[in-house]
Amino acid sequence: MKRIGAKKKPVYRIVVTDSRSRRDGAVIEEIGFYDPRANTEKGLPEVTLDVEAARRWLSHGARPSETVQGLLKRAQVYASPSSSTPDSD
């Protein structure tokens, strides 16, 4: 997520970036927008997401941050990897 917005009023762009880049550094592709302070009827934050782009990047091995992972789950784009621990007998 790339932080934009005014002081004490954060707004974020959901972006694809190289893991070695800074938080607000070089961006490969912008795939969404997140406003945690937006006033909506249900009291949920405003999220705009390009679902096709998100699925494409996840299929290519992109790893979302914890926050973006939660947003993707809410949009039903991301499913948690199942635990691969064997059952004990």
Curated annotation (Swiss-Prot):
One GO CC term, this protein: small ribosomal subunit
GO biological process: translation
GO MF term set: structural constituent of ribosome
InterPro entries: Ribosomal_bS16, Ribosomal_bS16_dom_sf
Protein's name according to its UniProt entry: Small ribosomal subunit protein bS16
Gene: rpsP
Alphabetical UniProt keywords: Ribonucleoprotein, Ribosomal protein
Keyword Ribonucleoprotein among UniProt keywords: yes
A Pfam family this chain is assigned to: Ribosomal_S16
Family: Belongs to the bacterial ribosomal protein bS16 family.
Superkingdom of this protein's organism: Bacteria
Organism annotation: Gloeobacter violaceus (strain ATCC 29082 / PCC 7421)
